[in-house]
Amino acid sequence: MKTVQEKYAFSKSEIKILRELVRGERSLSDLRKKLSFGPSLLSYNLKKLLDKGLIRENTRGFRKYVQFNDSKHASLLKNLLLVYYHIDWENLLVGKGLYILFQIISDFENSFYGVSKATFWRYLRRFRTHGILQKKVNKYEISPRFSILADFLNEYQLFFIKRIAEKLSSEAVVLWHRDFEFLVRVPKTVKVTSEKLHLTATSLFPSLGLPIFSEYNILFHSERKKNIKIEDAVLHTLLIERKNVRYVIYSLLLLHKYKEKIDVGYLKSEAQKYNLGVQIVSMLSFIETHSRQGDLPLPTWTEFEAKAREYGVTV
């Protein structure tokens, strides 16, 4: 079975077809002639672009035509190819190039897992030659001049994430996503068979001795993470709604209940990846000092004590 990364990847042939479509609808015969593609090669690549939600087909008389789809990610890619037509996207958005860009738009340190150093530096040179990437502190980021590229990457990623979620349930709601990892809320009746989906956040609380129940389950989709630790459950609970004090209290209850077992180093490291570093430090301090710091969403100690009694947590 293909990974998500393999499904979103572009080939040079796909980019060449898309370049032809930026100025309008084309017939299949026109594309074959213009690109020197045989019928089977053209058909194969059109099928992949259809699956990516980027194009649509229609038939008039005996001729079949293709054009860009009206979906948000398709419109953004069309504009990107049109505005920056002079850039050789065939050598930038193919292979590991797109994979590297997806990691760059993630809000944490560029680790570039799954990419050899030689491959990374090869693509980095290409991106920087065109001014697409710039370095800020110890991270690479997409230049503001290419904000349309960043917008496309975000929407393209969300397209695939929503597709996975919708296959789970028509009632599935994506709560958070980053680099093809995401949290999704589904009805408890949904049966999960994929090893890439893990029960997490408040849905794990009952098994951890905290009687918090819901008619929905929170699942974490990841192609890298094999199991969910208590620290992960704490962070995923915060990600449900970052500024909601209710979820902060739930996370605090779990942190306090297992404070002797929590791997603080792992917790802080993972928190940085989710832009929750400051929040976690404040929560750990809150547990130790019983007082709030700054304007972060934290309860008063009295409020926390009341919730702790309600859920049977000794404070």
Indicate where each model-derived feature is located:
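Short, amphipathic alpha-helical interaction segments positioned at domain boundaries
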Residues: 72-97, 145-180
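Short capping segments at the starts of secondary-structure elements
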Residues: 21-27, 103-112
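Hydrophobic alpha-helical interaction segments
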Residues: 213-315
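A short, conserved structural fragment
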Residues: 50-60, 128-138
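Short amphipathic alpha-helical interaction segments
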Residues: 36-50, 114-130
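A short acidic, leucine-rich amphipathic alpha-helix
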Residues: 30-36, 107-116
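Short gly/ser-rich loop at a beta-strand->alpha-helix junction or flexible surface loop bordering the NTP-binding
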Residues: 158-231
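Short, Lys/Arg-rich nucleic-acid/phosphate-binding segment
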Residues: 59-65, 71, 136-147
